[in-house]
Swiss-Prot record:
It is an enzyme of class 3 (hydrolase). HAMAP family: Inorganic_PPase. It is found in: Cytoplasm. One of its GO terms (cellular component) is cytoplasm. This is Inorganic pyrophosphatase. GO terms for molecular function: inorganic diphosphate phosphatase activity; magnesium ion binding. Its main location: cytoplasm. Belongs to the PPase family.
Length: 177
Protein backbone atom coordinates (compact mmCIF):
# COMPACT_ATOMS: atom_id res chain seq x y z
CA UNK A 1 0.00 0.00 0.00
CA UNK A 2 1.38 3.40 -0.95
CA UNK A 3 0.41 5.50 2.07
CA UNK A 4 1.36 8.72 0.28
CA UNK A 5 -1.62 8.28 -2.05
CA UNK A 6 -4.21 8.00 0.73
CA UNK A 7 -5.80 11.35 1.58
CA UNK A 8 -6.37 12.56 5.14
CA UNK A 9 -10.07 12.47 4.35
CA UNK A 10 -12.92 13.98 2.37
CA UNK A 11 -13.41 16.93 4.74
CA UNK A 12 -10.79 16.98 7.50
CA UNK A 13 -11.10 17.24 10.45
CA UNK A 14 -14.76 16.14 10.24
CA UNK A 15 -14.67 13.35 7.63
CA UNK A 16 -11.44 11.35 7.74
CA UNK A 17 -9.80 8.24 6.40
CA UNK A 18 -8.58 5.79 9.03
CA UNK A 19 -6.12 3.08 8.07
CA UNK A 20 -6.94 0.12 10.29
CA UNK A 21 -4.07 -1.83 11.83
CA UNK A 22 -5.94 -3.86 14.48
CA UNK A 23 -9.53 -5.09 14.20
CA UNK A 24 -12.16 -4.50 16.86
CA UNK A 25 -12.12 -7.52 19.18
CA UNK A 26 -8.66 -8.37 17.86
CA UNK A 27 -6.29 -10.69 19.67
CA UNK A 28 -3.65 -9.18 21.99
CA UNK A 29 -1.21 -8.45 19.18
CA UNK A 30 -0.10 -4.88 18.39
CA UNK A 31 0.19 -4.53 14.62
CA UNK A 32 1.56 -1.45 12.87
CA UNK A 33 1.74 -0.61 9.20
CA UNK A 34 5.34 0.11 8.24
CA UNK A 35 5.21 3.67 6.94
CA UNK A 36 7.86 3.07 4.24
CA UNK A 37 6.81 -0.29 2.79
CA UNK A 38 3.12 -0.34 3.66
CA UNK A 39 3.53 -3.86 5.08
CA UNK A 40 1.62 -4.91 8.18
CA UNK A 41 4.19 -5.70 10.89
CA UNK A 42 3.88 -7.26 14.33
CA UNK A 43 5.01 -4.50 16.70
CA UNK A 44 4.67 -6.66 19.83
CA UNK A 45 2.47 -9.14 21.64
CA UNK A 46 0.52 -7.51 24.46
CA UNK A 47 1.46 -8.91 27.85
CA UNK A 48 -2.14 -8.65 29.04
CA UNK A 49 -4.94 -10.93 27.87
CA UNK A 50 -7.12 -8.11 26.52
CA UNK A 51 -8.82 -7.46 23.21
CA UNK A 52 -9.12 -4.18 21.32
CA UNK A 53 -12.53 -2.55 22.01
CA UNK A 54 -12.62 -0.73 18.64
CA UNK A 55 -10.98 -0.91 15.23
CA UNK A 56 -7.61 0.77 15.76
CA UNK A 57 -5.28 2.51 13.37
CA UNK A 58 -4.07 5.92 12.28
CA UNK A 59 -4.99 8.95 10.23
CA UNK A 60 -2.74 9.33 7.17
CA UNK A 61 -0.80 12.56 6.64
CA UNK A 62 -0.92 13.47 10.33
CA UNK A 63 1.81 13.68 12.94
CA UNK A 64 0.98 13.46 16.64
CA UNK A 65 3.11 14.71 19.54
CA UNK A 66 4.80 11.30 19.80
CA UNK A 67 6.18 11.52 16.25
CA UNK A 68 3.78 8.91 14.83
CA UNK A 69 0.61 9.45 12.79
CA UNK A 70 -2.42 10.36 14.93
CA UNK A 71 -4.01 7.27 16.51
CA UNK A 72 -7.69 6.63 15.84
CA UNK A 73 -10.27 4.13 17.07
CA UNK A 74 -13.35 3.48 14.95
CA UNK A 75 -16.24 1.77 16.73
CA UNK A 76 -18.50 -0.14 14.42
CA UNK A 77 -20.86 -3.04 13.94
CA UNK A 78 -18.04 -5.44 13.03
CA UNK A 79 -14.25 -5.82 12.96
CA UNK A 80 -12.46 -4.24 9.98
CA UNK A 81 -9.61 -6.17 8.37
CA UNK A 82 -6.11 -4.74 8.95
CA UNK A 83 -4.94 -2.59 6.04
CA UNK A 84 -8.46 -1.46 5.14
CA UNK A 85 -9.30 2.23 4.91
CA UNK A 86 -12.53 3.38 6.52
CA UNK A 87 -14.17 6.80 6.24
CA UNK A 88 -15.17 8.03 9.65
CA UNK A 89 -16.38 10.97 11.73
CA UNK A 90 -14.40 11.89 14.88
CA UNK A 91 -16.56 12.27 18.00
CA UNK A 92 -14.00 12.73 20.78
CA UNK A 93 -10.52 11.96 22.02
CA UNK A 94 -9.30 9.81 24.89
CA UNK A 95 -6.69 12.02 26.53
CA UNK A 96 -3.80 9.81 27.52
CA UNK A 97 -0.10 9.90 28.27
CA UNK A 98 2.27 6.97 28.26
CA UNK A 99 5.90 6.51 29.25
CA UNK A 100 6.97 8.52 26.18
CA UNK A 101 4.55 11.44 26.66
CA UNK A 102 1.26 12.52 25.09
CA UNK A 103 -0.56 9.67 23.28
CA UNK A 104 -4.14 10.77 22.52
CA UNK A 105 -6.55 8.31 20.93
CA UNK A 106 -9.14 9.89 18.63
CA UNK A 107 -12.53 8.14 18.72
CA UNK A 108 -14.67 7.99 15.58
CA UNK A 109 -17.69 6.31 14.04
CA UNK A 110 -18.18 5.23 10.41
CA UNK A 111 -19.67 7.89 8.12
CA UNK A 112 -23.40 7.50 7.56
CA UNK A 113 -22.87 6.27 3.99
CA UNK A 114 -21.08 3.20 5.34
CA UNK A 115 -23.56 2.47 8.12
CA UNK A 116 -26.46 4.66 9.35
CA UNK A 117 -26.40 3.16 12.87
CA UNK A 118 -24.32 6.06 14.20
CA UNK A 119 -26.24 8.90 12.47
CA UNK A 120 -27.28 10.51 15.76
CA UNK A 121 -23.87 10.10 17.41
CA UNK A 122 -22.09 13.47 17.43
CA UNK A 123 -20.05 13.11 20.62
CA UNK A 124 -18.39 10.32 22.61
CA UNK A 125 -21.11 11.04 25.21
CA UNK A 126 -23.73 9.68 22.77
CA UNK A 127 -22.20 6.20 22.90
CA UNK A 128 -23.22 3.72 25.60
CA UNK A 129 -21.34 4.55 28.81
CA UNK A 130 -20.14 0.96 29.13
CA UNK A 131 -18.41 1.22 25.72
CA UNK A 132 -16.49 4.40 26.58
CA UNK A 133 -15.59 2.88 29.96
CA UNK A 134 -14.31 -0.29 28.22
CA UNK A 135 -12.20 1.81 25.85
CA UNK A 136 -10.70 3.84 28.71
CA UNK A 137 -10.13 0.66 30.76
CA UNK A 138 -8.35 -1.04 27.86
CA UNK A 139 -5.93 1.82 27.31
CA UNK A 140 -5.40 2.31 31.05
CA UNK A 141 -4.33 -1.33 31.47
CA UNK A 142 -3.07 -2.79 28.16
CA UNK A 143 0.59 -2.08 29.04
CA UNK A 144 0.33 -3.12 32.72
CA UNK A 145 2.64 -6.14 32.48
CA UNK A 146 5.23 -4.56 30.16
CA UNK A 147 8.35 -3.50 32.04
CA UNK A 148 9.05 0.23 31.82
CA UNK A 149 5.71 1.05 30.18
CA UNK A 150 2.74 2.89 31.65
CA UNK A 151 -0.38 4.80 30.71
CA UNK A 152 -2.51 7.43 32.41
CA UNK A 153 -5.95 8.53 31.26
CA UNK A 154 -7.01 12.10 32.05
CA UNK A 155 -10.49 12.00 30.47
CA UNK A 156 -12.23 12.68 27.18
CA UNK A 157 -12.00 15.69 24.88
CA UNK A 158 -15.15 16.90 23.14
CA UNK A 159 -15.61 17.00 19.34
CA UNK A 160 -14.47 20.64 19.03
CA UNK A 161 -11.22 19.98 20.88
CA UNK A 162 -10.80 16.81 18.83
CA UNK A 163 -11.11 18.81 15.60
CA UNK A 164 -8.32 21.09 16.84
CA UNK A 165 -6.13 18.09 17.77
CA UNK A 166 -6.57 16.77 14.21
CA UNK A 167 -5.89 20.18 12.60
CA UNK A 168 -2.69 20.46 14.63
CA UNK A 169 -1.60 16.93 13.61
CA UNK A 170 -2.21 17.74 9.93
CA UNK A 171 -0.29 21.02 10.23
CA UNK A 172 2.60 19.29 12.05
CA UNK A 173 2.78 16.68 9.26
CA UNK A 174 2.73 19.33 6.50
CA UNK A 175 5.51 21.28 8.23
CA UNK A 176 7.63 18.14 8.64
CA UNK A 177 7.34 16.70 5.11
Amino acid sequence: MDLSKIAVGVNPPYDLNAIIEIPQGGEPVKYEIDKESGALMVDRFLHTAMFYPANYGFIPHTLADDGDPADIMVVGPTPVVPGAIIRCRPIGTLMMVDEAGSDEKILAVPVDKLHPFYTGVTSWRDLPTILTEQIAHFFQHYKDLEKGKSTKISGWADPDETAEIIRTAIKRYNESY
